[in-house]
């Protein structure tokens, strides 16, 4: 809003620069063209940031904001209100705190508390001004957007004054207002602390989880893990306990919401897994691994290693039980689940799985899948074998007989992708007899149509689906 010619010799480093800027902003704020006054509003935080931090700055800024609030142009009024968050933040290091007039302006109240009068119908002018502000979507959105900055400046001790306004906004009629609050919920929780967040923000989060606007729910879920980890542990576990039911019911047709939930599994594991007596986090993982959307299954697959590693550090027996549960995927009737098991085995081989656990738990499953007639499963199997070979645990001479039969089956496979991978192994396989190959499983009738859900309750049962799909690409 303020432009100065080079030959004016105007430098911000000069001692009189703040004074000259203050004089300039006063001139343009009095301009008869409303667009000039509007542009000047956006310069207010920058101009007053370099003014001496004294009582004069407080009084001048309040005076200017009061005048702009009463400007004849609604566009100028709105521009001034857009700056309210930045203007309030100017006092973040001021021992005297934020001027009460600016706080009242932010809350939609008359700037001067003494101006609140009884209107004669059971309300005050404060109440009516507040109601008028919240009925305006532009002003409500500005308040919602600036809430974190205001709380950061004023401090958590002033939350009781701001809480009623915040709670009203969480139920605002306009979606974009609720969406803005959902986006900053975790930041406000960080500013307030765990106790106040549990008391005041958890109810708001619950409303957003069931919001009529999916965008609001999606925005909340982007940082839901950060929000939960800021809560007391028992409250976080209560919140987690509700998620599987939402996945299977409210979010069953919204894959992007399920994807957001799945992405938070790794960040929740270190804090919640070992104290999650109900197994909700593992249930959430199983829901992701069984999802009909490939991207969500992939997220679940890559979350397995951190869960296995956490269990293993705590108790080897629990880790084996978790791995055995995942091995059940290898015997599932759906080829999608069988392929998922092979993807799990591959990522575990890349990171955490030891040779003894592999031979004891995973290798029998690979032998079972060697006879699988579905191309997707066969391709996933050869890539898993490639990962095993890259660990250099075995040579052609010392392979366990079960793994030898898997290798023989893959060498006998006529699928070009499988043949190319087997030929690319280093060192090359030698002396493996094709006669050791596992015979193919009995072919079952194909079942065509869209991918059906495999789960209908949080106990994670296998549905009795007889299928042996044939496909030439990755399943959806």
Predicted regions and their residues:
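Extended, low-complexity, acidic/polar intrinsically disordered regions
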Residues: 1-476
């Amino acid at each position: 809003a303020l432009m100065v010619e080079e030959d004016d010799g105007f430098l911000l480093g000069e001692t009189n620069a703040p004074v000259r800027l203050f004089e300039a902003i006063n001139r343009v704020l009095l301009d008869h063209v409303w667009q000039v006054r509007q542009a000047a509003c956006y310069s207010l935080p920058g101009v007053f940031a370099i003014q001496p931090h004294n009582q004069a700055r407080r009084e001048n800024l309040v005076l200017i904001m009061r005048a702009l609030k009463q400007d004849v142009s609604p566009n100028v009024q709105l521009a001034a209100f857009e700056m309210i968050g930045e203007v309030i933040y100017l006092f973040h290091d001021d021992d005297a705190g934020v001027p009460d007039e600016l706080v009242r302006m932010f809350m939609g109240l008359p700037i001067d508390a003494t101006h609140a009068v009884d209107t004669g119908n059971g309300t005050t002018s404060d109440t009516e001004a507040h109601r008028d502000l919240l009925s305006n979507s532009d002003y409500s959105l500005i308040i919602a957007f600036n809430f974190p900055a205001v709380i950061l400046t004023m401090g958590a001790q002033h939350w009781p004054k701001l809480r009623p306004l915040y709670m009203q906004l969480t139920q605002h009629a306009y979606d974009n207002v609720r969406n803005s609050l959902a986006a900053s919920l975790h930041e406000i929780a960080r500013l307030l602390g765990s106790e106040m967040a549990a008391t005041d923000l958890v109810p708001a989060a619950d409303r957003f989880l069931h919001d009529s606007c999916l965008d609001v729910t999606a925005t909340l879920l982007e940082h839901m893990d950060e929000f939960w980890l800021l809560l007391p542990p028992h409250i976080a576990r209560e919140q987690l306990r509700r998620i599987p039911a939402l996945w299977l019911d409210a979010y069953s047709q919204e894959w992007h919401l399920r994807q957001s939930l799945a992405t938070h599994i790794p960040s929740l594991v270190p804090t919640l897994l070992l104290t999650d007596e109900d197994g909700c986090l593992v249930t959430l993982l199983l829901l992701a691994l069984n999802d009909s959307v490939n991207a969500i299954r992939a997220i679940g697959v890559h979350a397995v290693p951190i869960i296995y590693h956490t269990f293993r550090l705590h108790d080897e027996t629990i880790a084996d039980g978790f791995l055995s549960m995942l091995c059940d995927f290898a015997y599932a009737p759906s080829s999608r689940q069988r392929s998922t098991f092979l993807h799990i085995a591959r990522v575990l081989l890349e990171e955490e799985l030891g040779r003894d656990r592999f031979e004891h738990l995973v290798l029998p499953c690979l032998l079972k899948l060697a006879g699988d007639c579905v191309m997707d499963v066969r391709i996933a199997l050869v890539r898993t074998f490639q990962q095993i070979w890259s660990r250099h645990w075995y040579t052609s001479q010392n392979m366990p007989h079960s793994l030898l039969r898997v290798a023989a089956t893959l060498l006998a496979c006529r699928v070009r992708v499988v043949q190319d991978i087997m030929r690319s192994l280093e060192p090359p396989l030698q002396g493996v007899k094709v006669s050791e190959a596992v015979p193919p499983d009995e072919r079952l009738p194909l079942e065509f149509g869209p991918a059906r859900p495999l789960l209908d309750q949080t106990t994670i049962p296998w549905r009795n689906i007889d299928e042996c799909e044939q496909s030439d690409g990755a399943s959806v």
